């Protein structure tokens, strides 16, 4: 049973969070001139990559992404923006994440040709987390049936539970059937959408036999229990202790399931890091979604923060907590551990910084400046680079479908 192990790790994570209470925010400071020069250098590199893709890849109905990955212009952009050596990173890996990405998109489009891009990307985000876990475990990077199935359960179940035409009772009945399928009970399938979900569970069963890998299904049931709780309307405000535990359990359970569906079993070292990593991702999501959550009265640590001081304290604690989590990362060798730590550190930094920029009205100007000064390009220049990417991607998508 993983429940006891899970509870112990959540308790330890909560103590780690409490340990961040009085820590001050310390950031490396880049001068505005340095940030401007870095921004211009990255922008120039980004424009070269955009031109490269537009001239050599856009007209191809099946572009070779592995060839694109090897282009010197793209490698230079990654090196400048993410401050890491893509060649050294790739040399430490087995397999290829680009091929895993292509395989996933192909499988989705083959089975659900009308699925919106937003839902595909939602599932793809989880595939990338599982690919990162394959890297940590020293396994060959490849899309497995379990990775495909578990990642697709996100949009498939969300679509059903978000359907305005279904009553709360119907959604509750579906959750009961889903719980039965996860336990191996052959509950009746009522709709085509439910059939798709059931088939995903069967794919997982095909890779991980229940008798040999019981903890895989226990981890899936942890997520399911959180989903059932979410159907209950939030009424009385939760106290801080309750809110913290619910948040930590929700984030940790998702990534722990990722780990089990990659490895079948988890060492204590892996279980601990994936618990912490899941919590960081959940807190970062809550930070990003705080306005929307507050609008619909969805309680999270960040949607309940009512002033600059509270927002800044929570964000500073998240920054320190994410750094403490990364210390626990596991990998088969020191070289790969270094590269993975650098990659996740940069991605966490971007996630948190982007959210601070989005919700800058909830922070004091001083705090915003401190955060911005610690980013190589500064927050506003970083946002400009992201805008260039968004606009260009939308343009490519329009041309692709025309």
What are these regions (language model features)?
Residues 73-80, 181, 322, 351:
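Hydrophobic core of alpha-helical transmembrane segments in multi-pass integral membrane proteins
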Residues 350-402:
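Acidic, carboxylate-rich catalytic segments that either coordinate divalent cations
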Residues 84-153, 159-175, 181-294, 360:
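All-alpha helical catalytic cores of prenyl diphosphate-utilizing isoprenoid enzymes
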Residues 1-148, 156, 218-237, 392-402:
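Conserved N-terminal diphosphate/IPP-binding helix and adjacent helical/loop segment
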